[in-house]
Regions:
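A short acidic, Gly/Pro-enriched loop at the edge of an enzyme's catalytic core
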Residues: 98-109
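Conserved Class I S-adenosyl-L-methionine
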Residues: 182-253
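Short beta->alpha connector loops
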Residues: 33, 54-57, 113-119
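Conserved catalytic/acceptor-binding region of the Class I
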Residues: 120, 130-195, 215-220
Length: 253
């Protein structure tokens, strides 16, 4: 049965950012601020919106009223195809750490949900004076419980050499500091730790295949022994519990 659970997890498609497969297999608390609701509120009064690292475009596509000008970027090709289906031809293929291919002062709203890398100098450049940045970032130590079970103790975090760049997993002080160094005024910042539960090892496999930075280079074969221990624990003692870290930041140029 363990082999069957691994095989099932290895076969689930993991393109895009639709997490509906996990219903009944895993749970994660949601941040109290409601990013999608805030996004819809800000988008309703915007004239031009850019969604940086849109994933499969699912979040932006859910916004009921979009401004006249909408653009998005995405780096990962499997997500890019899904995003273009969801959003049309407005999605540019852009590496996470690259310059944004848009003119200065082109957008009055720049948004992002769980960006891998944030070029704060580029965010500030493409914003109009008075333009707004709204984003939900992954915080330091997110899902560390699972990462350390699979890989062993993790020390430190990924820090960028460029003071105007941050990566997924940055701490809240580093996030705000980089935004301010780029010339933005931070008007709101919040940070929450959120409980996650995995009800079977299949859900763990799918999660690690989908959220690839949790265990870099993860394959079922390479981590089979750890997965077998985890499978036995869940079968005998119930869900494996981890914690995600989420940060909301809003800033004005």
């Amino acid at each position: 049965m363990f082999d069957d659970r691994l095989a099932e997890g290895a076969a689930v498609p993991v393109d895009g950012w639709d997490f509906s497969w996990f219903d009944g297999r895993a749970t994660e608390q949601r941040p109290s601020w409601g990013y999608a609701r805030l996004l819809a509120d800000r988008a309703a009064s915007a004239k031009a919106l850019l969604d940086v690292q849109t994933g499969g475009g699912e979040v932006l596509a859910s916004v009921p009223v979009l401004p006249p000008v909408v653009a998005a970027t995405e780096s990962w090709e499997p997500n890019l195809a899904i995003a273009r289906r969801n959003l049309g031809g407005t999605v540019a293929h852009v590496a996470d750490d690259a310059d944004l291919p848009f003119p200065d002062g082109h957008f009055d709203l720049v948004v992002s949900r769980h960006p891998v890398t944030t070029r704060w100098d580029e965010v500030a450049r493409v914003l109009t004076p008075g333009g707004r940045y709204l984003a939900q970032h992954v915080g330091s130590g997110s899902v560390r419980d699972l990462t350390e079970f699979m890989m062993g103790p993790v020390t430190g975090g990924r820090r960028a050499a460029d003071p105007l760049t941050t990566h997924s997993g940055v701490d809240v002080v580093g996030l705000v500091t980089a935004a301010e160094r780029a010339g933005l005024t931070v008007t709101d910042v919040r940070h929450e730790a959120l409980r996650m539960e995995f009800f079977d090892v299949t859900a763990v496999v799918v999660f690690l295949r989908k959220v690839i930075w949790t265990v870099p280079g993860f394959t079922v074969e390479a981590y089979r022994d750890r997965l077998k221990i985890l499978d036995g624990f869940i079968e005998r003692h119930g869900p494996f519990v981890a914690h995600s870290q989420r940060m909301l930041i809003e800033a004005v140029r």
